[in-house]
Every structure is written in structure tokens, then in C-alpha cells.
């Protein structure tokens, strides 16, 4: 692994495997929604966060769906996801592909924080 990739923190984040992805969909420990996203979360007992992105076909054609996934991947890389949790992010609106990136990132970070804030209450 190059030093550049380790500096970005890629060692802390990992994508979910299919069986873990399915487990979160069947039994999410936490679920929060905003206007443009839904986040499912579940403790994983590991020392790193894992994430997945689920984009439904109704959001648009392959070009739109792939653009949404690229943008979400970058937002998740920039977000400080806490270790010990699995996250699945689902966009709820095709406008995620064209909306202002900074605004979307702020909304997603707030939603992730809200998802984990349930722990205290």
C-alpha cells in the first residue's frame, strides 16, 4: 500500500461485503432519513468503519446512478466515520447527482451524526 493511500485513511474505512450489506438491510440497528438520503447503521465489533452505497434503478439510468455513487464515495471518504460501525447510504432523490457537493456533504455528515446520536438517548 502506498504512503499516499495510508495518509488518506483508507486503512480505517472498508467497503461492506455482500453478506454484511444484506444483514444491515434486514436488521438495521439504526435508521435515519433526511430529504435526500437514508442511512442504515449497525455495530460491527471491528476497529474500523465499513460502508456501502445502495442506489436504486428508479433514480435514473446507469450514468446517473454511477455519478451518484462516485459522489457518495467521496463524501464518505471525507466524513469521519467512527470505528466499530457499518453504514449503508441510500440516496432518495436523483438530484443528488447534480446538487451542490458541499451542501450534500454537509447534509450527509449531519445525518450520520444524527444516526449515531441515538446511542445517548
Give the role of each language-model region.
Residues 1-121:
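Positively charged, solvent-exposed patches that mediate nucleic-acid binding
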